[in-house]
Structures are given as structure tokens and as C-alpha cells.
Amino acid sequence: MSFETISVIGLGYIGLPTAAAFASRKKKVIGVDVNAHAVETINRGAIHIVEPDLDKVVKIAVEGGYLQAVTKPQAADAFLIAVPTPFKGDHEPDMIFVESAAKSIAPVLKKGDLVILESTSPVGATEQMAQWLAEARPDLSFPQQAGEAADINIAYCPERVLPGQVMVELIQNDRVIGGMTPKCSARASALYKIFLEGECVVTNSRTAEMCKLTENSFRDVNIAFANELSLICDEQGINVWELIRLANRHPRVNILQPGPGVGGHCIAVDPWFIVSQNPQLARLIHTARLVNDGKPLWVVDRVKAAVADCLAASDKRASEVKIACFGLAFKPDIDDLRESPAVGVARLIAEWHVGETLVVEPNVEQLPKSLMGLVTLKDTATALQQADVLVMLVDHKQFKAIKPEDIKQQWIVDTKGVWR
């Protein structure tokens, strides 16, 4: 059965580019999102997120009649679920959005349909999704019941893209395809090959789920090593960026760069999925999470020390000292603030500091709710002119372009080594 109509559930940072990629190959794509503003924006041929080149692809797809956004699922030949999978307060995975998405498409499923879960999920999530669908549609058979003869094929296929490079990597990167049966894997592979130039690597759903978690946990552990080095070097009076540059001249050493912590919807979240299911075994992964989650507190301590030095060297009162935080996104040159340590640092500083806290984030037009009423959003030039203490949190290209002579401040906390 060919895939004439493809539905993508969730039109966020992964879902919308995926929908656009299929639509660019002249497939009819129905994008579904509960956010009415996002749906309206997309149907105008515009986008509600920041991602290079995505706006052009969406505009062409909408104007050509290949991409339509709606708030409720419609019949299709393939459904891709790309909704958030956050964790709860106890770091347990929260699958409520996946469950809701599965139950929303259940009424429109028909024999021969393919359902793919893309959302990063704990091991066993695909099987759980299949169970939810089976309970909602007892008139259809599913892989856990009928194997290769199932009416509905189900697979898990995680994304592997870098924000800011999504429209390139979505097409070029290899894809892990984890079907509940070999037929499920084959059909999922055929679907992605509509736009994929990379290789479809087939496995089972549980291995595919663990593969995604492993990739991001590996990166988290390596970042934790760099962040721990930054703490040690600060204590020992060593420039951590020089140290890493020298150590990386060893042909088998590749230390990552430290920062204010780890953010985003993947690296800061996914390791907890492994830890929650394997608390006694995932000791290294757990420790890395604690190191990275603790780094923002260390940054705030450095800021407090800088303010104390500023007060000791000037005749200003604490209420007169202005602190400027540069960057809120979880990585450079994007607008995504999810799980961003920079947001947490800015909030902690603003809650502690009696003076004004300025924030510079060139990729957003308004502050997140967690910072409203606490900080003031400023442009780069104004912040440099007004602030007494500078805090570099995200190495956006705009910040890297700041000339040394434009920085007059003596008190600087640079978590990214931009002004080293």
C-alpha cells in the first residue's frame, strides 16, 4: 500500500520539519496540533518556530496544496507521532501526550495504516502505544496480537537532528527503524525513504528506543566530564578552555566544551528515562545528570562573587548594581528555551539580586513566563552600556561578534569562554 496521505501529530521543532519534508516530495500531508495559533500560522504558509530554511519549505508546501494543518486528526495512510515526552517532578517519564495522541488517531485508523512513534520515550513505550490503540479499536488487529498479519503496522523511529540544522540532517542522517515486526520495519523504512537520503537501519522497537536514549546519555556523560573539569580548573586557577585545547591535541582525546549546564528536550531529559527504569544500574548516567544539573548553581555562586567584588571596588549599593545575562536558549543561534540552564541561571540571579537583572536573547521577542516580572529584556548594546556585571550563558554568533573594546566591565562570568 502506498502512502498517499501522511499525518504528523505534533507540529513542533521535529514534527513540523518532518511534515514539511514529506510535503516537499509532493505527498499530501496533514499536520495535527492542539495549538490553534500554530495551525493558523502554518496554514498561512508561515512558521511559529525558528529553524533555518524551514519557512521556505513550509511556504512552498502550503501554497502548493501539499501541507495542511488541523487541530483534530483526519484519515491518513501513515501517522507519525512527534509530541513532547517530558519527565515528572520525580524524573519519571510522562507519557500523557503520547497516550493522548494515540487515542486521538484511533477513531480514524483503518486496515493497512502505519503508526510510527518518533517521540523520545522509555523502553517499552511503542508496545504501550500499541496497547492503547488496541484497546480503543478492538475491531482492528495489532502486531502484539497478530504479528505479521496485523491490520495496523507499528514502529518506533527516533529523530537524530541538531536544532539549527534540522532541514539538512533530517534528510541526510541515517535513521534507526524499530518495527514491532519485520513487516512493520519494512513499511516504516519505505515511508522514510520518501525523503531520506541516509540509510534506514532496521532493528526492533525496544532496541530503537534504547538507542535514542543511549545516544543522548553518551553526550550527557561527556558534557558532565567537561563541566566537572571546569569546576576543578576554577578551584586550581587554570583556564579550562586552554586546558581542553591542549588535551585535545592528543590524537585519542576529544573533550567537549563546558557550559552553564545542559538543556534542551533531549540531552537534559533522556538520561532520566534510563535512570528511572534502571536505578541500581545506571550509576554513571545518574551521576552525570547530577553534575550537569548542578552546574547552574555553581554559575550563580560565581555571579554572587562577582557582585561582591563590584561592591567592594565601587561606591555603589547592591540595588544599584545591574547584572546582564547573555543568552537564554539551550544552545547557540536558536529560539528553543526548553530545559535551558541559562533560563534557570537568569531566574536564580534575578530572585537573589536586589538590583536590576537584564537579559539579552536576540532569538526571542518576549520573555518566558518563568522570567516575566523578574528580568528586563534588552538588546546587546544597551546591556553592555548599562550593566556592571556580565554573565555569558549562550555563545550566540551575535555575542561572539562583540568587539573586545566594547566591553568595559571588569566583572565578567563567562561560562562559554567567549570573552576569555
Curated annotation (Swiss-Prot):
Residues annotated as catalytic: 212, 266
Pfam families xref list: UDPG_MGDP_dh, UDPG_MGDP_dh_C, UDPG_MGDP_dh_N
GO biological process, one term: enterobacterial common antigen biosynthetic process
SMART domains, per the entry: UDPG_MGDP_dh_C
Broadest EC class assigned to this enzyme: oxidoreductase
EC number: 1.1.1.336
Family: Belongs to the UDP-glucose/GDP-mannose dehydrogenase family. WecC subfamily.
The name this protein goes by in its record: UDP-N-acetyl-D-mannosamine dehydrogenase
Originating species: Yersinia pestis
Lineage: Bacteria, Pseudomonadati, Pseudomonadota, Gammaproteobacteria, Enterobacterales
Name of the gene this protein is made from: wecC
